Swiss-Prot record:
NCBIfam families: IMP_synth_hisH. It comes from the Bacteria. GO terms for cellular component: cytoplasm. This is Imidazole glycerol phosphate synthase subunit HisH.
Amino acid sequence: MSTIAVIDYDMGNLHSVCKGLEKAGATPKITDSSIEIDKADAVILPGVGSFDPAVQHLRTRNLEIPIKQVIASGKPFLGICLGLQILFESSEEGQEPGLGIFAGKVCRFKSEPGLTIPQMGWNKLQFTQPEHLLWSEIGSQPWVYFVHSYYVDPTDSQVTAATVTHGHQTVTAAVGKDNLIAVQFHPEKSSTAGLKILSNFVSKVIPKNLALAS
């Protein structure tokens, strides 16, 4: 059974993520310890809230370097919601530099007549990396749950693993590269499709990346 470090930096409720992981057969461990993060089979960086406080909390807990080391080591890593955004270089929402794992920035949805910002509720994913193991056996264009006013805009469009269309704006909803995958939506709130995504991370993504790293 895989042990997954769920990083705690005071940015959101971690327990719903942990429940989803337990249903998928993993053992989640909420932690802000670099030692526990290093020992885990995989790492999840969740998050709800604003960009600047998130990166400030990570840095005051001395978690920036351990996160970068884990990703560089090849260990499976999943970012969720704000945990996706802070992997980028900067955000229109704040002044703090992000972690810079991905080149690009975080942008706010542009206003449109009749468009609600934040996007809050269910929307369809369009896969741009349909062969990614995270999407295995889910079917095309699954409905997943979003709550966000900002989206990531990668410099390299090849890292985009899925998109979502809100109003007339089609934006990145997930990125994937090597051992790193991160999603804007909340799999833990996305019913059957979301639980399957977490299950795929546990049963397919983790074993593959651990095998490659060994």
